[in-house]
UniProtKB/Swiss-Prot annotation:
The keyword Chaperone does not apply. The lineage of its organism: Eukaryota, Metazoa, Chordata, Craniata, Vertebrata. It comes from the Eukaryota. SUPFAM superfamilies: L domain-like. This is Decorin. It comes from Sus scrofa (Pig). One of its GO terms (cellular component) is extracellular space. Disulfide bonds join 55-61, 59-68, 314-347. Gene3D superfamilies: Ribonuclease Inhibitor.
């Protein structure tokens, strides 16, 4: 009886299943020899089934997270666990995403491909990712946005690439999209198709900063709450370009070349709370601030503003229903602070919220 028990224990040790990582930072392989010499012979037994999916070599797998970052990979690893929810492939040397690279990853929610050398993505590469919500492709060499992105996608970040075109067709059917980040690309206004973003009914956040665009993109969706266009070459704010943006709460237009803000522009954004127009070429305070009901933060520093009127920011009189300002910056403008009437800021919440300074 004892001999039988010893035989079974030895058989289990000798024919152990293949290596499986049990934790995110567990790279240690158990000793496969287990003290059994080559002269030992046992009858053949069926190979034990692995307890779970294999983890790609050198990657770390834990709780449906597969981390393969900073490994010098030049292609997507094979045999990825089918239950993977987050796949991190950032900081590698991958040059191409091919059809079949993500096959069987039907549970993937987040795909991180930041800081690779990707210049080509096959049209059907993302087709198997039927639950993908977040796609990070920043710091690569893409010239166009990928085609046939999953309809479940909510967040797309593709800044610091070589994108020159944004076609309306690439966003068709992406009705769940909330965030689009396209900053730091050699993109021009002519490269953005009119109404390219219009079909995304839930889109809330767009950032197209540090590009070569000269105008605010046309046909933006009314669902937008944040629009960041800082660091471009925009010279004028057109009232028509902001028409219909009834839900916009934050507008970033700093570090452009804006000299004019059309009358009525701010009226087209009735729920705007924060306006960044710093580091431009404005020679006066934009019209419409005093009548705007909700705006609370206005950045106008580093412009060419030489005078500030007593009704530029607040409605006439002290009995006003306008929301109080919590921040107004006017420093680094030609206007001298002692030339501004104290009543100019009668609707500012606290005096410390006003930033004035000498022009340099």
């Amino acid at each position: 009886m004892k001999a039988t028990i010893v035989f079974l224990l030895l058989a289990q040790v000798s024919w152990a299943g293949p290596f499986q990582q049990k934790g995110l930072f567990d790279f240690m392989l158990e000793d496969e020899a287990s003290g059994i010499g080559p002269e030992d012979r046992f009858p053949e037994v069926p190979e034990l089934e692995p307890l779970g999916p294999m983890c790609p070599f050198r990657c770390q797998c834990h709780l449906r997270v597969v981390q393969c970052s900073d490994l010098g990979l030049d292609k997507v690893p094979k045999d990825l666990p089918p239950d993977t929810a987050l796949l991190d492939l950032q900081n590698n040397k991958i040059t191409e995403i091919k059809d079949g690279d993500f096959k069987n990853l039907k549970n993937l929610h987040t795909l991180i491909l930041i800081n690779n050398k990707i210049s080509k993505i096959s049209p059907g590469a993302f087709a198997p990712l039927v639950k993908l919500e977040r796609l990070y492709l920043s710091k690569n060499q893409l010239k166009e946005l990928p085609e046939k992105m999953p309809k479940t996608l909510q967040e797309l970040r593709v800044h610091e690439n070589e994108i020159t075109k944004v076609r309306k067709a690439v966003f068709n059917g992406l009705n769940q999209m909330i965030v689009v980040e396209l900053g730091t690309n050699p993109l021009k206004s002519s490269g953005i198709e009119n109404g390219a973003f219009q079909g995304m009914k839930k889109l809330s956040y767009i950032r197209i900063a540090d590009t070569n665009i000269t105008t605010i993109p046309q046909g933006l969706p009314p669902s937008l709450t944040e629009l960041h266009l800082d660091g471009n070459k925009i010279s004028k704010v057109d009232a028509a370009s902001l028409k219909g943006l009834n839900n916009l709460a934050k507008l970033g237009l700093g570090f452009n070349s804006i000299s004019t803000v059309d009358n009525g522009s701010l009226a087209n954004t009735p729920h705007l709370r924060e306006l960044h127009l710093n580091n431009n070429k404005l020679n006066k305070v934009p019209g419409g601030l005093a009548e705007h009901k909700y705006i609370q933060v206005v950045y106008l520093h580093n412009n060419n503003i030489s005078a500030v009127g007593s009704n530029d920011f607040c409605p006439p009189g002290y009995n006003t229903k306008k929301a109080s300002y919590s921040g107004v910056s006017l420093f680094s403008n030609p206007v001298q602070y002692w030339e501004i009437q104290p009543s100019t800021f009668r609707c500012v919440y606290v005096r410390s919220a006003i930033q004035l300074g000498n022009y340099k």
